[in-house]
UniProtKB/Swiss-Prot annotation:
It is found in: Cytoplasm. Its EC number is 3.1.11.6. Heterooligomer composed of large and small subunits. It comes from Streptococcus pneumoniae serotype 19F (strain G54). GO terms for molecular function: exodeoxyribonuclease VII activity; nucleic acid binding. It catalyses: Exonucleolytic cleavage in either 5'- to 3'- or 3'- to 5'-direction to yield nucleoside 5'-phosphates. This is Exodeoxyribonuclease 7 large subunit. Bidirectionally degrades single-stranded DNA into large acid-insoluble oligonucleotides, which are then degraded further into small acid-soluble oligonucleotides. GO terms for cellular component: cytoplasm; exodeoxyribonuclease VII complex. Keywords: Cytoplasm, Exonuclease, Hydrolase, Nuclease. PANTHER family: EXODEOXYRIBONUCLEASE 7 LARGE SUBUNIT (PTHR30008:SF0). InterPro entries: Exonuc_VII_L, Exonuc_VII_lsu_C, OB-fold_nuc-bd_dom. It comes from the Bacteria. GO terms for biological process: DNA catabolic process.
Length: 446
C-alpha cells in the first residue's frame, strides 16, 4: 500500500533540499525588476526574463547599502540564496548584493541623485552667487598634500600677492570623505573673514571622485553663505558639486584665476590710468581758472574798486537817517501811551472797592452768627423732644407704670386679631413674665 505524504511534510523535505544544496546557497542571477513598489523597510518584488519569474527579497539593511534605487523594468545582476517559504510552498531568492546590468551602480546613482536634486531646484541659476572682485582671504577645502593647494597658492600669489589662503585639510576620497568635505565647508562658513571658498581635488576614476557626488556635499555647497568654486578632477570629469557650485573651474589654476579676477597688475594699471586722468583734469581746471582770473584782473572793478561800493555808501546814509527819524517817532508815541495808561490806573484804584467789600463782609459775618445761633437752638429743642418721645416708647418704663406687654413668638401683640385659641403668649410685667395660653378671643365692638 502506498504511503501518502502531507503537504507540510513534502514542503519541509523540499526546504531541506534547498537549504542543503550547495548550488542554491549562492546563486548568481540576472533578470528584470518587476512588480516593484518601494517600501520603507524591506523590498519585495519579482525578477523575470522572457520565460520565467522568481520572487525576490532584499532586507532593508542590504537595500540601503546598494547605492542606487531599484526601478520598475531595470535589469540587474544579483547574488543571493534560494529558499522555500513553507506557508505558501513557494520559493524565492534572498538578495545579498545587486548592481545594474551593463551600467555601473555609481552611474545609476549619479543620474538618480541628479534628477532628485534638479527637481528640488538646487541647480537653478537664480541661486548662484556672484564671485567677489577683490578677496582678502580665500578658503580652500582639499587635501594637504595634493597638487591642488600648491597650484592655487602659486597662482594667487602670482596674480595678487597679499591675498591670504586658508587651507582646510580634507580627505577627498574613500570612506568618510564626503562627511569631512561637508563638515569643512560648514566650518569655513562660520568665519567672518573669508570672502570665497574653493573646493576640489585632482583627477581620478569615478570612484575616486565620488565623494563630490554625495548628497551631503551637494547640500553643503548649496547652503554655503560663501560663494563656492568647484575644481574636481580634469576638465572632462563632471560631478554634482560642479552643478551646484557658483562657478566651476577645469583646473585648480583656473579656480585660482576665477578667485582673483582682477590681478595686482590690473589694479596698478588702473591706478596709473586714473592718475593720468586726474592730472589732465587738474591741469584743465587750472588753465580755465587762470584764464578767468586774468579776465577778472582786467575788469573795471579791479582797476577802480571804489566804484564797487559807492552806491552802497549812499544807500547806507539814507537808511541811517530813516532809522533816526523812526526812533524819535517811536519814543514820542510810547511816552504818550505811558501817560494815558497812568491816568487810567489812578482812576481805577482798587482801594475804594476793597473798603466797600470789607464793610459788606463784616455785615455778612454778623448775620451768619445770629442765624447759626437760631439754627442751633432749634436743633437742641428737636433733640430734646425726640429723646422724650423715645423714653415714652421704652418698654421698661411702660411696665414700671403698671402696664403689661403681650408678646407672641418675640413679637409684640397689638391686636386680638393676631391671636387665636390655644396660642402661647408671654406677658411681660414690671417684676417678671408669665407664660399663658389663649382660651378664647373676643373682638371689641366699635
Amino acid at each position: 500500500m502506498e504511503k501518502y505524504l502531507s503537504v507540510t511534510t513534502l514542503t519541509k523535505y523540499l526546504k531541506m533540499k534547498f537549504d542543503k544544496d550547495p548550488y542554491l546557497e549562492r546563486v548568481y542571477l540576472t533578470g528584470q525588476v518587476s512588480n516593484f513598489r518601494k517600501r520603507p523597510t524591506h523590498q519585495y518584488f519579482s525578477l523575470k526574463d522572457d520565460h520565467a519569474v522568481i520572487q525576490a527579497t532584499i532586507w532593508s539593511g542590504i537595500y540601503q547599502k546598494l547605492g542606487f534605487d531599484l526601478e520598475e523594468g531595470m535589469k540587474i545582476n544579483v547574488i543571493g540564496r534560494v529558499q522555500v517559504y513553507e506557508p505558501s510552498g513557494s520559493y524565492s531568492i534572498i538578495i545579498e548584493k545587486a548592481e545594474p546590468d551593463g551600467v555601473g551602480a555609481l552611474a545609476i546613482q549619479f543620474e538618480q541623485l541628479k534628477k532628485k536634486l534638479t527637481e528640488e531646484g538646487l541647480f537653478q541659476e537664480r541661486f548662484k552667487q556672484a564671485l567677489p572682485q577683490f578677496s582678502k582671504r580665500i578658503g580652500v577645502v582639499t587635501s594637504r598634500s595634493g597638487a591642488v593647494i600648491r597650484d592655487i597658492i602659486t597662482t594667487v600669489s602670482r596674480r595678487f600677492p597679499g591675498v591670504d589662503i586658508l587651507l582646510y585639510p580634507t580627505k577627498v576620497q574613500g570612506e568618510g570623505a564626503a562627511e569631512e568635505i561637508a563638515r569643512n565647508i560648514a566650518r569655513a562658513n562660520q568665519r567672518d573673514d573669508l570672502d570665497l571658498l574653493i573646493i576640489g581635488r585632482g583627477g581620478g576614476s569615478i570612484e575616486d571622485l565620488w565623494a563630490f557626488n554625495e548628497e551631503i556635499v551637494v547640500r553643503a555647497i548649496f547652503e554655503s553663505r560663501l560663494p563656492v568654486i568647484s575644481s574636481v578632477g580634469h576638465e572632462t570629469d563632471v560631478t554634482l558639486a560642479d552643478f551646484v557650485a557658483d562657478r566651476r573651474a577645469a583646473t585648480p589654476t583656473a579656480a585660482a584665476e576665477l578667485a582673483t579676477p582682477v590681478t595686482k597688475l590690473d589694479v596698478l594699471a588702473h591706478l596709473q590710468n586714473q592718475e593720468k586722468r586726474m592730472v589732465t583734469a587738474v591741469r584743465n581746471v587750472l588753465s580755465k581758472k587762470q584764464e578767468a582770473l586774468k579776465k577778472c584782473s582786467q575788469s573795471v572793478i579791479f582797476r577802480q574798486p571804489e566804484r564797487l561800493y559807492d552806491g552802497y555808501l549812499q544807500r547806507l546814509d539814507q537808511l541811517q537817517l530813516r532809522l533816526k527819524q523812526s526812533l524819535r517817532t517811536r519814543i514820542s508815541d510810547n511816552k504818550q501811551l505811558v501817560q494815558a495808561r497812568t491816568h487810567q490806573l489812578v482812576q481805577l484804584s482798587p482801594v475804594t472797592k476793597i473798603q466797600r467789600y470789607q464793610d459788606r463782609l463784616g455785615q455778612l459775618d454778623k448775620l451768619l452768627g445770629s442765624q447759626m445761633a437760631l439754627v442751633y437752638d432749634a436743633k437742641v429743642a428737636e433733640v430734646k423732644r425726640l429723646s422724650e418721645a423715645l423714653l415714652m416708647l421704652d418698654t421698661s418704663r411702660i411696665v414700671a407704670r403698671g402696664y403689661a406687654i403681650v408678646k407672641k413668638e418675640e413679637s409684640v401683640v397689638d391686636s386680638v386679631e393676631s391671636l387665636k385659641k390655644k396660642d402661647q403668649v408671654t406677658l411681660l410685667m414690671r417684676d417678671g413674665q408669665v407664660e399663658l395660653e389663649v382660651k378664647d378671643v373676643k373682638t371689641k365692638e366699635i
